[in-house]
From Swiss-Prot, chains A, B:
It catalyses: XMP + diphosphate = xanthine + 5-phospho-alpha-D-ribose 1-diphosphate. GO terms for molecular function: xanthine phosphoribosyltransferase activity. GO terms for cellular component: cytoplasm. Keywords: Cytoplasm, Glycosyltransferase, Purine salvage, Transferase. This is Xanthine phosphoribosyltransferase. 5-phospho-alpha-D-ribose 1-diphosphate binds at residues 128-132. GO terms for biological process: purine ribonucleoside salvage; xanthine metabolic process; XMP salvage. Coiled coil: none annotated. It is an enzyme of class 2 (transferase). Converts the preformed base xanthine, a product of nucleic acid breakdown, to xanthosine 5'-monophosphate (XMP), so it can be reused for RNA or DNA synthesis. It comes from Lactiplantibacillus plantarum (strain ATCC BAA-793 / NCIMB 8826 / WCFS1) (Lactobacillus plantarum). CDD domains: PRTases_typeI. Its main location: cytoplasm.
């Protein structure tokens, strides 16, 4: 998505450890008009996927997910993060390891919000090692729902998350695919196709 | 806002301790179309307030705040919650006590996202004792920005948050004002004006 790539080049900052900081428009300060454009793009990409519900993880996934939900007119459920989980009778839970923070969290959603006939689109702001997506897969499996696809705002294709989703045979659409960092420069997969 | 009140009556559940559970459309599962209608209503209510930025607190405030931001075409910043705060040089922080959870959290936002000429609209999903709003007031004061108003999705007018905002002389607009719970029945301020 050209508009997003341009914004990353303009406002993103590359930090040591191949971390891209985009807190100016995506995950701390949010640009709602850009989010809406992204939601519309997700709706377009998954228009034939029979999506009945969108699932994401708090907090950074919420803005892109609700905009996709607005464009697709389907409900959005955001999984809650906890240090630990108690009283889990009414919850589907999964453990998610964060490579950035080097800690484990549990994510959970109330069972009543996933029905067996749901076709669920998973949305998240970043795809790196795919731990959050894997946690959402686990929750979907426990709920016996069909996964309609995975929609990612910014994907680092050189990390392991991409393969994890491919191995599962689930369709992945990322609005910006970063192939490499070169010092503080960001390279996108779209550069190759444009060349 | 009639549509919101009807949804509360249909899907809300009153729990002991005057807690209204609305996890079916507001703070766990989200109805994006209703959120957009609410965002449009906030934009209408504050159209003459000169709003340059919206501030909210993760996670439940994000969906209504980004929809208001979409309708007003202004950026949205969501404050992060932490158990404790370290490395605060670049952050504005405030302590927020939760009466529901009986714990204190710190909220923070990066200093660079509040400029002295900003006129900030504070948005949150619930107003009860007003602790989150008070935390946002504190952050705005530290940043020397003007507070353009407070927009709340569901207000419990019989708790102390309403007065806290009135005492500060800040304009408050709530899309649903709950005056009392009567067993599992919810009463709105609009019932009085309609009578």
């Amino acid at each position: 998505m050209r508009e997003l790539e341009e914004r990353i080049l303009k406002d993103g900052r590359v930090l040591p450890g191949e971390v891209l900081k985009v807190d100016g428009f995506l995950n701390h300060q949010v640009d709602p008009d850009l989010m809406f454009a992204m939601g519309t793009e997700f709706a377009h990409l998954f228009q034939d996927a029979g999506v009945t519900k969108i699932l994401t993880v708090e907090s950074s996934g919420i803005a892109p997910a609700v905009m996709a939900g607005l464009a697709m007119h389907v409900p959005v459920v955001f999984a809650r993060k906890h240090k630990s989980v108690t009283l889990i009778d009414d919850l589907y839970t999964a453990e998610v390891y964060s490579y950035t923070k080097k800690t484990s969290n549990h994510i959970s959603i109330a069972k009543k919000f996933l029905q067996a006939d749901d076709q669920v689109l998973l949305i998240d702001d970043f795809l790196a090692n795919g731990q959050a997506v894997q946690g959402m897969f686990e929750i979907c499996d426990k709920a016996h729902v069909k996964i309609a696809g995975v929609g990612i705002v910014i994907e680092k294709v050189f990390q392991t998350g991409h393969q994890l989703i491919a191995d599962r045979g689930v369709r992945l659409e990322s609005l910006a695919q970063i192939t490499s960092f070169d010092g503080d420069r960001v390279h996108f997969a779209s550069e190759d196709t444009q060349a």
